[in-house]
Curated annotation (Swiss-Prot):
<dbReference type="Pfam" id="PF00006">
    <property type="entry name" value="ATP-synt_ab"/>
</dbReference>
<dbReference type="InterPro" id="IPR000194">
    <property type="entry name" value="ATPase_F1/V1/A1_a/bsu_nucl-bd"/>
</dbReference>
<comment type="subunit">
    <text>F-type ATPases have 2 components, CF(1) - the catalytic core - and CF(0) - the membrane proton channel. CF(1) has five subunits: alpha(3), beta(3), gamma(1), delta(1), epsilon(1). CF(0) has three main subunits: a(1), b(2) and c(9-12). The alpha and beta chains form an alternating ring which encloses part of the gamma chain. CF(1) is attached to CF(0) by a central stalk formed by the gamma and epsilon chains, while a peripheral stalk is formed by the delta and b chains.</text>
</comment>
<keyword id="KW-1278">Translocase</keyword>
<keyword id="KW-0472">Membrane</keyword>
<dbReference type="GO" id="GO:0046933">
    <property type="term" value="F:proton-transporting ATP synthase activity, rotational mechanism"/>
</dbReference>
<protein>
    <recommendedName>
        <fullName>ATP synthase subunit beta</fullName>
        <ecNumber>7.1.2.2</ecNumber>
    </recommendedName>
</protein>
<feature type="compositionally biased region" description="Basic and acidic residues">
    <location>
        <begin position="7"/>
        <end position="18"/>
    </location>
</feature>
<feature type="region of interest" description="Disordered">
    <location>
        <begin position="1"/>
        <end position="61"/>
    </location>
</feature>
<dbReference type="InterPro" id="IPR027417">
    <property type="entry name" value="P-loop_NTPase"/>
</dbReference>
<keyword id="KW-0547">Nucleotide-binding</keyword>
<dbReference type="GO" id="GO:0045259">
    <property type="term" value="C:proton-transporting ATP synthase complex"/>
</dbReference>
<dbReference type="InterPro" id="IPR050053">
    <property type="entry name" value="ATPase_alpha/beta_chains"/>
</dbReference>
<dbReference type="InterPro" id="IPR004100">
    <property type="entry name" value="ATPase_F1/V1/A1_a/bsu_N"/>
</dbReference>
<keyword id="KW-0067">ATP-binding</keyword>
<feature type="compositionally biased region" description="Polar residues">
    <location>
        <begin position="44"/>
        <end position="55"/>
    </location>
</feature>
<keyword id="KW-0813">Transport</keyword>
Length: 537
């Protein structure tokens, strides 16, 4: 009886020492249920004070204490069994809930964890509770129209995400036998993309570019064009980018009716098409290293329910960068250019999950920042192997004022195959690239000797190349406020027709300016006639 009374007292002490936030209402229904189960598990678990050697696999509700805090890395010591690798631990930080993810098992019953939020306010000796599971996020239609953080908590101040469905952010990639192998083009309405580097439905697309060449604007235009035409669900993962851009995107989605404004709909987001998961620049590296996985988990759930999902990531380089920061804090020896030694493994674990199955598809569009415009940098170079199409944004094209600043010669797609796109499309794309390649080769001669030294044939080719270059520009819907021009969505048929005529020389009589920032070729002809009439008057 005395022993039983003692154990009850010990259990009540453990209960009393739990953080206040743990007993409060959670932001998702599923989390509160998990919290109740965890507290019962702690209450009913036997005292482990007598155990000195770590047992295999810690039990849910095990209690440890903080031994060391180094930035985003927290060392926690347990008496008895250690939590499994990737388990989520929970503690109190200045009255709010802080999640730690187990990364390493050290000696002396200690685990090294990565914090999913800032560690300000943590102290040595503070109690930490093992949840017994990995980080789980809410999934399903309740997430649509909402902004969540890395652990699935809503940050849009619209109330809790009411769902009982949650899913671990660490999942295995689908088996090879489950994957779909069909090839189909995803038409974006952007001329340069659809003609020269078409996207694959259910494939992976990379937008490569340095700082300030238009990656985010292009992603926002793709969301606007595809999400509207496509009609399915989308998931946007903001990884280590500007908070302002995330805020703008949220309101633009409401304005373009992709999402429903909950403030005008009695707090409901029913009818929304896109879920947003943000881990922005100001977040610790732990959050930035995991937020892409959180977004992907939501997308995978929709795919497994039979949906065709669009998954946008801005920016995949920040995922690598966060992994590099975490790796250094964990004490791993850096690899090439200071990146983590597990760079290829980390990237592969994420990218292999972004795939289409026989149930549904995930079409992924990923912005990839290129440090110092160097495509051979290990971070962008590691991404190349996983992509079905690459859209390379060039600073030299942006300097000419041509937007989107897509490099027509560096961009590539495995879909540009006559068996997939058809003979006409393939032939026109090859003609355009041949003319632009010849123009690029002649630019040194033009710069040194001038146009007069070229042959008549080359002069004609240069004129066509300059018209093609300008016709590759296009006004965007999401940039209307900046350009003052209404956005244009161009069908694939109109795109092929326009470039076929340009290559054949059908529009050699029109001024070059007629082809700049227009949609279809008919608009260019109309603009050209207007310019010629103004010049002659």
């Amino acid at each position: 009886m005395a022993k039983a009374a003692t154990s009850k007292k010990e259990a009540s002490k453990v209960e009393a020492k739990k953080p206040a936030a743990r007993l409060g209402a959670k932001k998702t229904v599923s989390k509160s249920e998990e919290s109740v189960k965890t507290s019962q598990s702690v209450k009913n678990s036997p005292s482990r004070t007598g155990s000195s050697s770590p047992q295999k696999g810690g039990k849910k509700g095990a209690v440890g204490e903080i031994k060391q805090v180094i930035g985003a890395i927290v060392d926690v010591q347990f008496e008895g069994a250690l939590p499994n690798i990737l388990n989520a631990l929970e503690t109190d930080r200045l009255g709010s809930r802080l999640i730690l993810e187990v990364a390493q098992h050290l000696g002396e019953n200690t685990v090294r964890t990565i914090a999913m939020d800032t560690t300000d306010g943590l102290v040595r000796g503070q109690k930490v509770f093992d949840t017994g599971t990995q980080i789980c996020v809410p999934v399903g239609e309740a997430t649509l129209g909402r902004i969540m953080n890395v652990i699935g908590e809503p940050v849009d101040e619209v109330g809790p995400i009411v769902t009982t469905k949650t899913r671990s952010i660490h999942q295995k990639a689908p088996e090879y036998i489950e994957q779909s192998t069909e090839s189909e083009i995803l038409v974006t309405g952007i001329k340069v993309v659809d003609l020269l580097a078409p996207y694959s439905k259910g494939g992976k697309v990379g937008l490569f570019g340095g700082a300030g060449v238009g990656k985010t604007v292009l992603i926002m235009e793709l969301i606007n064009n595809i999400a509207k035409a496509h009609g399915g669900y989308s998931v946007f993962a903001g990884v280590g980018e500007r908070t302002r851009e995330g805020n703008d995107l949220y309101y633009e989605m409401i304005e373009s009716r992709v999402n429903v404004n909950p403030k005008e709909n009695d707090g409901s987001t029913k009818g929304s098409k896109c879920a947003l998961v943000y881990g922005q620049m100001n977040e610790p590296p732990g959050a930035r290293a995991r937020v892409a996985l959180s977004g992907l988990t939501i997308a995978e759930n929709f795919r497994d329910e039979g949906q065709d999902v669009l998954f946008f990531v801005d920016n995949i380089f920040r995922f690598t960068q966060a992994g590099s920061e975490v790796s250094a804090l964990l004490g791993r020896i850096p690899s090439a250019v200071g990146y983590q030694p597990t760079l290829a493994t980390d990237m592969g674990a994420l990218q292999e999950r972004i795939t289409s199955t026989k149930t549904g598809s995930i079409t992924s569009v990923q912005a990839i920042y290129v440090p110092a415009d160097d495509l051979t940098d290990p971070a962008p170079a590691t991404s190349f192997a996983h992509l079905d199409a690459t859209t390379v944004l060039s600073r030299s094209i942006a300097e000419k004022g041509i937007y989107p600043a897509v490099d027509p010669l560096d961009s590539f797609s495995r879909m540009l195959d006559p068996l997939v796109v058809g003979e006409e499309h393939y032939a026109v794309a090859c003609q355009v690239q041949t003319i632009l390649q010849r123009y690029k080769a002649l630019q040194d001669i033009i710069a040194i000797l001038g146009m007069d030294e070229l042959s008549e044939e080359d002069k004609l080719l240069v004129g066509r190349a300059r018209r093609i270059e300008r016709f590759l520009s296009q006004p965007f819907h999401v940039a209307e406020a900046f350009t003052g021009s209404p956005g244009k969505l161009v069908s694939l048929e109109d795109t092929i027709k326009g470039f076929k005529g340009l290559c054949a020389g059908d529009y050699d009589d029109l001024p070059e300016a007629a082809f700049y920032m227009v949609g279809s070729i008919d608009e260019a002809i109309e603009k050209g006639k207007r310019l010629m009439a103004e010049a002659s008057s």
